Amino acid sequence: MFTKRELKSINKSYFNVVRYVSEMNYIEIQSRCSKDYWIIQKGDPAYYGYPIILYHKHPGQQYYHRHWQCYNVNQTISSIKSHDAYKKLRKWNDK
């Protein structure tokens, strides 16, 4: 289950919350910067090896792929923002 502090760390001006399914321990968000979609799923570290698994898909794609594994929600948010910065830089360099 996500704590109130973890949910607060998901900045609503940077992310659009698509859905939050507390029973399944995941939150689906969209980056307003890149328009990419993300699922932050909390799981059993004994099973997954990490407490949080991050899934990703681009706009127009149907399925998510496993993007990263993290130790906490702040690390997850940082990973998403880093991906957005990379995508923005790559897009700028492709012009």
How would you label these PLM feature ranges?
Residues 1-35, 61-62, 93-95:
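Negatively charged, low-complexity tracts enriched in Asp/Glu with abundant Ser/Thr
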Residues 4-8, 55-95:
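Mixed-charge, Lys/Arg-enriched low-complexity segments
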Residues 15, 37, 49-50, 70, ...:
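Low-complexity, intrinsically disordered short peptide segments enriched in small/polar/basic residues
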Residues 17, 27-29, 38-40, 52-54, ...:
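Hydrophobic beta-strand residues in large extracellular and virion-surface proteins
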Residues 35-65:
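Short aromatic-glycine-(Arg/Gly/Cys) micro-motifs in beta-strand/loop hairpins
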